[in-house]
């Protein structure tokens, strides 16, 4: 991803829901660079969804809209449990 987008991505990681803040920002800071380009695009796409949607996916209350987002959510969950 273009270096110019890093600030925007980091800003979008800051969520209105504190629980999501505690999950998404640390994942971004620790693992984003290690993701493939496709996974990075999926991460950015995931950030465009609302906090309630993201929270439901992370808490397994409803399925994510794509397999790629589901896989990324599971990586975020695994990073929390590690």
From Swiss-Prot:
The keyword Chaperone applies. Its main location: cytoplasm. Gene3D superfamilies: Flavinator of succinate dehydrogenase. The keyword Isomerase does not apply. It is found in: Cytoplasm. InterPro entries: SDH (IPR005631), SDH_sf (IPR036714), SdhE_FAD_assembly_factor (IPR050531). One of its GO terms (cellular component) is cytoplasm. GO terms for biological process: succinate metabolic process. It holds the Pfam family Sdh5. Keywords: Chaperone, Cytoplasm. An FAD assembly protein, which accelerates covalent attachment of the cofactor into other proteins. Plays an essential role in the assembly of succinate dehydrogenase (SDH, respiratory complex II), an enzyme complex that is a component of both the tricarboxylic acid cycle and the electron transport chain, and which couples the oxidation of succinate to fumarate with the reduction of ubiquinone (coenzyme Q) to ubiquinol. Required for flavinylation (covalent attachment of FAD) of the flavoprotein subunit SdhA of SDH and other flavinylated proteins as well. Belongs to the SdhE FAD assembly factor family. This is FAD assembly factor SdhE. It comes from Haemophilus ducreyi (strain 35000HP / ATCC 700724). The gene is sdhE.
């Amino acid at each position: 991803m273009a270096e110019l987008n890093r600030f925007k991505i980091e800003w979008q990681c800051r969520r209105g829901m504190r629980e999501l803040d505690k999950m998404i920002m640390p994942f971004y800071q620790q693992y984003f660079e290690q993701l493939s380009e496709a996974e990075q695009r999926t991460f950015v796409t995931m950030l465009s969804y609302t906090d309630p949607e993201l929270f439901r996916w992370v808490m397994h209350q409803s399925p994510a809209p794509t397999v790629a987002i589901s896989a990324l959510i599971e990586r975020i969950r695994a990073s929390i449990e590690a």
